[in-house]
Amino acid sequence: MALSKAEILDAIASLTVLELSELIKDLEEKFGVSAAAAAVAVAAPAAGGGDAGAAAAEKTEFDVILASAGDNKVNVIKAVRELTSLGLKEAKDLVDAAPKAIKEGVSKADAEAAAKKLEEAGAKAEIK
């Protein structure tokens, strides 16, 4: 019995991320292709689409930038440690090197929460 496209899609949709990753590897081996090369080829025309392509990419992933530590540097270092799980020295170095990215490629909600936490600690934060 042949499976329909809808049945195949339903089966794929029910897979976990790990199972899906393994499926992709198996398909790459079986057909001698690379999913990464296909993703680049598909993404290239979208990126050439101008501002619409850039705006679509920014809507899903955001970077939280520490613009400046402000007056209360100790609290900012504590906030950076909480957000990044860095050690004390690494967090201090990151705060001293501002403007610097604190979190990269996070969701909008996570970016806003991180920026709020930094601002509450006395820092100036930006979401890009």
From Swiss-Prot:
Domain of life: Bacteria
GO biological process: translation
A molecular function GO annotation: mRNA binding
Keyword annotations of the record: Ribonucleoprotein, Ribosomal protein
An example Gene Ontology CC term for this record: cytosolic large ribosomal subunit
Keyword Ribosomal protein assigned: yes
SUPFAM superfamilies to which the protein is assigned, alphabetical: ClpS-like, Ribosomal protein L7/12, oligomerisation (N-terminal) domain
CDD domains associated with the record: Ribosomal_L7_L12
InterPro entries in UniProt: Ribosomal_bL12, Ribosomal_bL12_C, Ribosomal_bL12_C/ClpS-like, Ribosomal_bL12_oligo, Ribosomal_bL12_oligo_N_sf
Quaternary structure annotation from Swiss-Prot or TrEMBL: Homodimer. Part of the ribosomal stalk of the 50S ribosomal subunit. Forms a multimeric L10(L12)X complex, where L10 forms an elongated spine to which 2 to 4 L12 dimers bind in a sequential fashion. Binds GTP-bound translation factors.
NCBIfam families in alphabetical order: L12
Stated family: Belongs to the bacterial ribosomal protein bL12 family.
Functional summary from the UniProt entry: Forms part of the ribosomal stalk which helps the ribosome interact with GTP-bound translation factors. Is thus essential for accurate translation.
PANTHER family, alphabetized: 39S RIBOSOMAL PROTEIN L12 (PTHR45987), LARGE RIBOSOMAL SUBUNIT PROTEIN BL12M (PTHR45987:SF4)
Record-given protein name: Large ribosomal subunit protein bL12
